[in-house]
Amino acid sequence: VHLRRQRQMCIRDRVYAGHQFGNWVPQLGDGRGILFGQIETSNGLKDLHIKGAGKTPYSRFGDGRAVLRSSIREYLCGEAMHGLKIPSSRSLIIFTGEEPVFRETTEPGAMIVRSASTHVRFGNFEYLCHNDKKELLPELMTHVIEEYFSEYNELENKFELFFESVVRKTAELIAHWQTVGFAHGVMNTDNMSILGETFDFGPFGFLENYQPDYICNHSDYQGRYAFNNQPNIGLWNCQALAAALSPIIEETALKLSLIHISEPTRRALI
């Protein structure tokens, strides 16, 4: 990757909403992360994000910290995904220190610098739609298209083409997951990237032996995010995004894109 130049941007934490285990949560946000930079590279735009930076306005009852154990796991999985040629965020640097972090046990704290093509999530659109901020949807959509889908910028149906691309990228990503036996574990809509990148590594796992109902998240009591249910959840999440975009995209266009989700999945699996 060759660095072309760094873009000027404000250091910020972002608000979003989401469906967590199918339940609507009207406000979430970067509870322990800060987006501090964006660079232009030979592989396109890359966000730079610190995870574990401390409390933000969206930390709720959390301490805003990350632990060394999960930071190392995220680093290793991001590199594994990259090696497998599966779209993924990656980790650049891990910092650790002597200050303890209290979870189920006391653990060493850490911060991780993450790079990703974008940090725009399904949940950013959900937040605007379902919190009486629908008038801001076209502004966010226009910005996202200018940044990441510039080939659609001058087209009249650019919003529809954006959604169709998100659906396709999501389907292809999950198809890649299924081929390598990867279970994400927390496929909430706020953990879904609009560019179809593996994002927000948590209690993920890989199948050691073929076990289609494998559950890697011990908090997933009902198996919502079981390995064999990931394609269904991908579709469910795209439907949630469609609902959030319904004020600015006609229902017929949204439904057509969702109907086509099975075809890119099938092609990717082949």
What is each stretch, according to the model?
Residues 1-7, 11, 259-270:
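Single conserved hydrophobic/aromatic residue that forms the stacking wall/gate
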Residues 12-152, 197, 237:
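Conserved ATP-binding subdomain of kinase catalytic cores across diverse folds
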Residues 71, 100-184, 195-258, 262:
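ATP-dependent phospho-/nucleotidyl transfer catalytic cores
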Residues 187:
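Hydrophobic HxD+1 residue recognition
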